[in-house]
């Protein structure tokens, strides 16, 4: 008899684990792996943020805080939402958690009943599907082939009486696609016709954008304000992935329920990390411009290099630090060892085993025959990785 709960059968390890395990095995054998799979900035947390954490430690701010976050951090979040997104919230509409992932998990736990449908545009961040499944919801995956974005027509075709949530992730992981003001306005028109559908916006890459301005949907259509729940955090913008601070902003009764769940699980987020996050949101943002310029230069370099690889096709992302690369041109080809590349998983395994480059298969994000490549790495590593990928493509197309 298994001691595991039946609900564990509803979730599965990410396909990325196999790549990670294989990369670690090769590293253990002394091989140098070019890892282009990172989901976090490669820069350090800015000094003024670290200094705020050190000061909090020295001042003895090491006790429990309010379950839903310190007053100072909630005020900083409220200021940020008004400053950056032109949205006004009260403290009882904010809950701080141990990362954006936790507050999203709690939001779904607090609201999804068995059979409730959640519309998830694909490609999607890997955790959305399993979170919905864990609470006996029904993920309604919408494959978005037009610039990797949900269209009003696609959305309208998927809404039913059972639809509870629409998930919008912009800029998107894994594609870097970002919705424009007009695109969000058009999606809003559909949502205004279906008052039972709530919207969660995963805005975690908000400050890593390039050629367009960022908008969140409640900013574009104020009539949706009470139905929109913004999930965000300090991980990506401020290079604070390990600090584990995220937050949700939305209707107070749902936010209260999220806080209640948190009170019976993790309790408050780390007190020192909250002090650091407060400084991140309130402090100097000058470094963001320089950091974004660095990412943009890397993006442009990678797009040009990889578009020269036979069999690959790369579109230009508008945000985040990923390329979502079509590998359809190498499918059906053979490696030097005679193995046929049937899909994106085969291709990523080939890149790692034969060319020592670690990337993530698109199937992990709900869209086959693509690979996700992170450019959150040094220029030297990116050049090594690109050259290795180009060589890999040339080899399998001539074998």
PLM region descriptions:
Residues 2-4, 12-14, 19-22, 26-32, ...:
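PLP-dependent class I/II
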Residues 37-40, 55-73:
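A glycine-/small-polar-enriched, mobile loop at the entrance of the PLP active site in fold-type I
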């Amino acid at each position: 008899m298994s001691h595991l709960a039946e609900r564990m059968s509803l979730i599965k390890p990410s396909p990325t684990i196999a790549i990670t395990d294989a990369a670690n095995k090769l590293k253990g054998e002394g091989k140098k792996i070019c890892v282009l799979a990172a989901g976090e900035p490669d820069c350090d947390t800015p000094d003024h943020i670290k200094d705020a954490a050190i000061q909090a430690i020295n001042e003895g701010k090491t006790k429990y805080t309010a379950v839903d976050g310190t007053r100072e951090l909630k005020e900083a979040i409220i200021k940020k939402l008004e400053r950056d997104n032109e949205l006004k919230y009260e403290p009882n509409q904010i809950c701080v958690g141990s990362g954006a992932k936790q507050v999203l998990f709690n939001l779904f736990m607090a609201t999804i009943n068995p059979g409730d449908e959640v519309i998830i545009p694909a490609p999607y961040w890997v955790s959305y599907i399993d979170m919905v499944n864990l609470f006996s919801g029904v993920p309604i995956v919408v494959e978005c082939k037009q610039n990797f974005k949900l269209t009003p027509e696609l959305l309208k075709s998927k809404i039913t009486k059972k639809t509870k949530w629409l998930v919008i992730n912009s800029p998107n992981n894994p594609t870097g696609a970002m919705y424009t003001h007009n695109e969000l306005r058009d999606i809003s028109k559909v949502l205004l016709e279906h008052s039972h559908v709530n919207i969660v916006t995963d805005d975690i890459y908000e400050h890593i954008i390039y050629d367009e301005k960022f908008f969140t949907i409640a900013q574009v259509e104020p009539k949706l304000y009470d139905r929109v729940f913004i999930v965000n955090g300090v991980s990506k913008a401020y290079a604070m992935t390990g600090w584990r601070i995220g937050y949700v902003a939305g209707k107070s009764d749902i936010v209260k329920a999220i806080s209640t769940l948190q009170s019976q699980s993790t309790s408050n987020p780390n007190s020192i990390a909250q002090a650091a996050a407060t400084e991140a949101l309130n402090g100097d943002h000058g470094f963001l411009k320089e950091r974004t310029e660095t990412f943009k230069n890397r993006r442009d370099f990678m797009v040009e290099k990889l578009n020269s690889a036979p069999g690959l096709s790369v579109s230009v992302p508008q945000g985040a630090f990923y390329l979502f690369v079509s590998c359809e041109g190498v499918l059906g080809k053979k490696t030097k060892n005679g193995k046929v590349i049937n899909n994106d998983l085969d291709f990523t395994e080939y890149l790692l085993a034969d060319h020592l480059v670690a990337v993530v298969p698109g199937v992990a994000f709900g869209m086959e025959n693509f690979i996700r490549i992170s450019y959150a790495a040094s220029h030297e590593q990116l050049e090594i990785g690109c050259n290795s990928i180009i060589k890999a493509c040339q080899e399998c197309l001539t074998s």
